[in-house]
């Protein structure tokens, strides 16, 4: 799947989704926008034509797994989603960025080739491969662990001043900095640390290869 995902706060209690398709060679009409409701919410996908050699058909399903092989199809589908306050958001693309602005609930954002930017009053989790991650979270009471991972890009988190967490942060070509006082466990280095912020407890995992990691305190 190719295209950006842009989520922003709705003014009312209705979810509004706009999908914009464009291409140079392939037929945009061949890419279907599917809506799949479930007990947990609604899943909206761009479903590309299934390639002849695909092992399974392209389809839109709920949950973390669905098949979406595009082969040489160059259709790009950009989604704009207006999300009401209190509604959790899960955004997933492959070739594109994910931008989430001023939402009022928890956020999960995933891409492969693209950056991730999140701003929410809840907590968040994000993964990419080629791109940076920037996240501002209004809550720091996630139940178990949250993780932010990339390979080529930095990670910058803005977190509440009352944060308590067990932090594991690693980078290869970069540095790790924190505005929060840290009680370090084991060896501390500029590229790796395991430490406690506040009372500890819940886990915060941060990992990159080429990029720096920054924990910033919000007021």
Question: Where are each of the predicted segments found?
Answer:
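Intrinsically disordered, low-complexity terminal regions
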Residues: 1-219
């Amino acid at each position: 799947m190719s295209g950006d995902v842009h989520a922003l706060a709705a003014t009312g209690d209705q979810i509004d989704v706009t999908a914009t398709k464009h291409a140079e060679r392939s037929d945009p009409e061949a890419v279907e926008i599917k809506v799949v409701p479930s007990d947990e919410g609604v899943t909206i996908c761009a479903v590309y034509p299934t390639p002849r050699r695909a092992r399974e058909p392209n389809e839109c399903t709920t949950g973390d797994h669905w098949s979406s092989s595009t082969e040489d199809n160059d259709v790009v589908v950009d989604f704009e989603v207006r999300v009401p306050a209190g509604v959790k958001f899960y955004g997933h693309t492959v070739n594109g960025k994910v931008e989430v602005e001023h939402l009022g609930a928890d956020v999960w954002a995933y891409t492969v080739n693209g950056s991730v930017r999140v701003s929410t009053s809840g907590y968040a989790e994000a993964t990419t491969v080629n791109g940076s991650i920037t996240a501002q979270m209004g809550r720091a009471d996630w139940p178990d662990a949250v993780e932010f991972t990339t390979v080529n890009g930095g990670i910058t988190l803005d977190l509440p001043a009352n944060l308590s967490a067990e932090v594991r942060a690693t980078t290869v070509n970069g540095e790790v900095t924190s505005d929060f006082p840290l009680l370090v466990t084991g060896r501390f280095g500029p590229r790796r640390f395991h430490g406690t912020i506040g009372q500890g407890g819940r886990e915060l995992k941060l990992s990159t290869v080429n990029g720096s990691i920054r924990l910033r305190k919000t007021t």
